[in-house]
Amino acid sequence: FDTSWEGLDKSYELHDSAYRKIFDRCGLKYFVVGASSGAMGGTGSEEFMVKSAAGEDTVAYCESCGYAANVEVAASRIDSVERDTESKSIYEISTPNVHSIDELCEFLKIDEIQCAKSRIYIHDEKPVLILMLGNDEVNETKLEKVLGGNVRPAHPEELKDISGADAGSIGPVGFSGRIIADNRLKDANNMFSG
């Protein structure tokens, strides 16, 4: 409700100070984390967190550097997949009764990091394929931010019509909609995918 950015900054500092005093007086060990501003929008949102096994949020926290963020907005510092020096041609492998990354890794005797997992979401009534490493999961809050909201996972009964495959066999090859790949796949090649 401030009339200027300077006033907003001052109000923010006063609220921050008040919260810190409350937590200090309660004797709570707390930390401030970057957070999603949610439906209100905007930037620079922060939350005060107290470590607890009975909370509703999960926080990424680094004791050595002090970085802390709600997992909805946490930035990954995990290395990308290393590129093989020689790119192989695309080829098909029959994987009968294989319906998950774990089953695929067991069947092919490979590591999850060699797999590119696909998930299909619907954005404004159009399919979008999300491609990530086999051991990763989609962060739907970040996906909504990238796509601009109005996003939902495709229903199981929609998958065959959209991709021609069942949930455990979907891949990017031949997919006709938009594809969004995780940054960790930036230079990856020779991956196994549905």
Give each language-model segment a name.
Residues F1-G194:
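Extended, low-hydrophobicity, polar/charged segments
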